[in-house]
UniProtKB/Swiss-Prot annotation:
The gene is rnhB. It comes from the Bacteria. This is Ribonuclease HII. InterPro entries: RNase_HII (IPR022898), RNase_HII/HIII (IPR001352), RNase_HII/HIII_dom (IPR024567), RNaseH-like_sf (IPR012337), RNaseH_sf (IPR036397). Residues 35-225 form the RNase H type-2 domain. Endonuclease that specifically degrades the RNA of RNA-DNA hybrids. One of its GO terms (biological process) is DNA replication, removal of RNA primer.
C-alpha cells in the first residue's frame, strides 16, 4: 500500500547518532541496526540535458573497511577514472544496487525537485531486497516510499552507503551522456556531461535545444526565429 506521506524518523529514534564524526557506518551505534540499510543519492539535478539519475546501494558491513581504505567519497570529488574504479568495486561488494531516473519530459512536467525524488523512489523500489532503512542524501524525504528513511544533508560525506550511491549514479549517468553525445555532437556533451558549460551555452544559442534538453530550464528556452 502506498503511503501519502514519507515515513521518516522525525518521531522515531534513529539507531545511529547523526552527530557522530566520520562515517556513520563506523559509528559504534551502527551495530544497533538489525537489517539492511540502503544509501540513496542522485546526480544530474543541475544539468541542462538528459535525465536526473538516482542510485540505491545496500552495502554489507564487511565492505566498510575496504571502502574506507579505498578512500571512497562524494563522487564530485573524484576523478572520472577513480569513480569508474570505485563503481566496479562497489558493484562487486554490494548486496544490491539499482538505478532509477526521471526523463527530461518528466522533469519539465513536474519540476526538477519532484523529478529528483521520483528517480530516488524508483531506484529504491527496484531493489530486490527491501531495506529496513533508507539514508537519503539532502533534506527532502522521498514521498510514497513505505520504508523508514532518514535525510542527511551532505550525506555523501557522512555515509558510505550514500557515497556509494553517489558514485554509482554518477558513473551510470556519465556513461549514458557519453553515448548520447554521438547523436548531439554540437553541444560538447562528452566534456560537460549535460551541464551548462560555456561551449554548451553557446551551442544552445546557435542550434537551439535538442529534444533531450530541459525546456523548463531558462538556458534551454531559446528561440532561433
Amino acid at each position: 500500500m502506498m503511503l501519502k506521506k514519507a515515513q521518516t524518523t522525525d518521531n522515531l529514534k534513529l539507531p545511529i547518532s547523526l552527530n557522530a564524526t566520520g562515517w556513520l557506518e563506523s559509528s559504534p551505534d551502527w551495530s544497533n541496526i538489525s537489517g539492511l540499510v540502503a544509501g540513496v543519492d542522485e546526480v544530474g539535478r543541475g544539468a541542462l540535458f538528459g535525465p536526473v539519475v538516482a542510485a540505491s546501494v545496500i552495502l554489507p558491513a564487511s565492505s566498510f573497511p575496504q571502502l574506507m581504505t579505498a578512500e571512497i567519497k562524494d563522487s564530485k570529488k573524484l576523478s572520472h577514472s577513480r569513480r569508474v574504479q570505485l563503481a566496479q568495486q562497489i558493484s562487486t561488494l554490494a548486496i544490491d544496487w539499482r538505478i532509477g531516473y526521471a526523463t527530461t519530459a518528466e522533469i519539465d512536467r513536474i519540476n526538477i525537485l519532484q523529478a529528483t525524488l521520483l528517480a530516488m523512489r524508483r531506484s529504491v523500489k527496484k531493489l530486490k531486497l527491501q531495506p529496513i532503512l533508507c539514508l537519503v542524501d539532502g533534506n527532502q524525504p522521498v514521498q510514497d516510499l513505505p520504508i523508514l528513511q532518514q535525510t542527511i544533508v551532505k550525506g555523501d560525506e557522512r555515509s558510505l552507503n550514500i557515497a556509494a550511491a553517489s558514485i554509482m549514479a554518477k558513473v551510470w549517468r556519465d556513461d549514458l551522456i557519453q553515448r548520447l553525445s554521438t547523436k548531439y555532437p554540437m553541444y560538447d556533451l562528452k566534456s560537460n556531461k549535460g551541464y551548462g558549460s560555456k561551449k554548451h551555452l553557446l551551442a544552445l544559442e546557435k542550434h537551439g535545444a535538442s529534444p533531450l534538453h530541459r525546456q523548463s530550464f531558462r538556458p534551454c528556452q531559446i528561440s532561433l526565429d
